[in-house]
Amino acid sequence: MKAAHYVGGGFRTDGAAFALVDPVDGRRVGDVPEATRQIVDEAVRAARAALEDGWGRTGATERAAALRRIADGIQARFDEFVDAEVADTGKPRELAATVDIPRAIGNFRAYADLLYGRPERAYTTDVPGWSATPGAGTGQALNYSVRRPLGVVAIISPWNLPLLLLTWKVAPALAAGNAVVAKPSEETPSTATLLASVIDQAGLPDGVFNLVHGHGTDAAGEWLTRHPGVDAIAFTGESATGAAIMRNAADHITPVSFELGGKNPALIFADADFDAALDGTVRSCFTHSGQICLCTERVYVERPVFEEFVAALGERARALEGYGPMISAQHRDKVLSYYRLAVEEGATVVAGGGVPTFGDDRDNGFYVEPTVLTGLPETARLVREEVFGPVCHVAPFDTEDEALRLANDSPYGLAATVWTRDLSRAHRVAPRVETGIVWVNCWNLRDLRTPFGGVKASGIGREGGEYSLDFFSEPVNVCIQI
């Protein structure tokens, strides 16, 4: 399906176009319409009109049914979504078919279920100065709370997991009764356009969901986040972009929810199951060629097993096949610049560090080698800055306290993994790691009901389950004297 805006219940392709490039072989495969300021404004006004026409007052039953129709619509076009995801990102088809698209379907179904049975507290309060006289009531007041939608929500999603992370925000926003204006990454417009088609066929009122394509600075992203008609902003992407959006949001004191970058550590203790820790670290470093915010970029290994682990990790990295490209030539060049910088800073290259040769059209694509490095100081830029590619730096530690100091010495704090057979150590270490998520003897094992998000420069707020529903709605206290 050709990329198109979806505004007020209609598809449109007006606006200048920019190229859509296949990262696998570098070919131009399509054009994407660039939203003008007017199109963004029309999308926000369409969303506001949908709220005023009654969407914000619909009951949970109607909203849950709409979410389930959307989930069913994605399921019915499953292969089409997989094809679009692979075409935009170049990721392995198996990853799209087993993670991205099923999780997107699951997001809508999960929030349909969560709409029922949310507990709300009620309190009775004594009325000051009350006396028991005829007609004076009970001398008490009943306080209870209800939640209402925020209004028009701007959702800006990234290119690495384009459908999954778009639906991760759209589903709870719609569940809470908001109207949405979404802007996907300019690199990955296809699954977002397909989602708009599914929502259109699901019969939601015109304007409840709107989609605009375009870039960020002085373009659709900036115009949307500065728009006075937007009541909240939810964004996943780079920390620097999050800071820019926060400045835009400050003009109107617009609430924000951010899931930003990470420089995630793995702590591997000598008592860990070596093979399990190795398998898990290969996954956490190199899945989707490291282009997942949760991927590991810093690996700390207890000294007794350090040399063995480094050798095994390097061997596994060299043996990897079937991995995907970087999303763009620009991002490939950024990752390669970090590879060169690491060597300049004194790194030892255990595996990778360059560009692979395939002998086919992929040689024109945006690939880099899975890379394992050692020998850098903790002050090195590659150890401090997010690369967002298939690279990790491995360093030794001697004590539990040193491992924690190394893990926490970062401007980021999204996720961490801990590998140990010692259950007491796991319970002791996990709360001391300064991240929003800690996995013990696993990686990226997710439950949609749990809080998801980071600390420091990795984000503001939490997503998932009731945490998302709380962000996308506001509590109203009602006090009735009885």
Predicted segments, located by residue:
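Short, structured beta/alpha segment
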Residues: 1-87
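A structural signal for short, well-ordered beta-strand elements
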Residues: 19, 33, 56, 213, ...
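Conserved C-terminal structural/oligomerization subdomain of aldehyde/semialdehyde dehydrogenase
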Residues: 25-31, 230, 267, 360-482
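Residue-level signal for inorganic ion chemistry
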Residues: 26, 63, 85, 177, ...
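Structural signal for hydrophobic packing residues in well-ordered secondary-structure cores
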Residues: 51, 55, 71-78, 82, ...
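N-terminal Rossmann NAD(P)-binding subdomain characteristic of aldehyde/semialdehyde dehydrogenases
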Residues: 56-57, 65-166, 210
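Rossmann-like NAD(P) dinucleotide-binding subdomain of oxidoreductase/dehydrogenase enzymes
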Residues: 120-276, 397
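ALDH superfamily catalytic-core signature
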Residues: 232, 240-377, 440
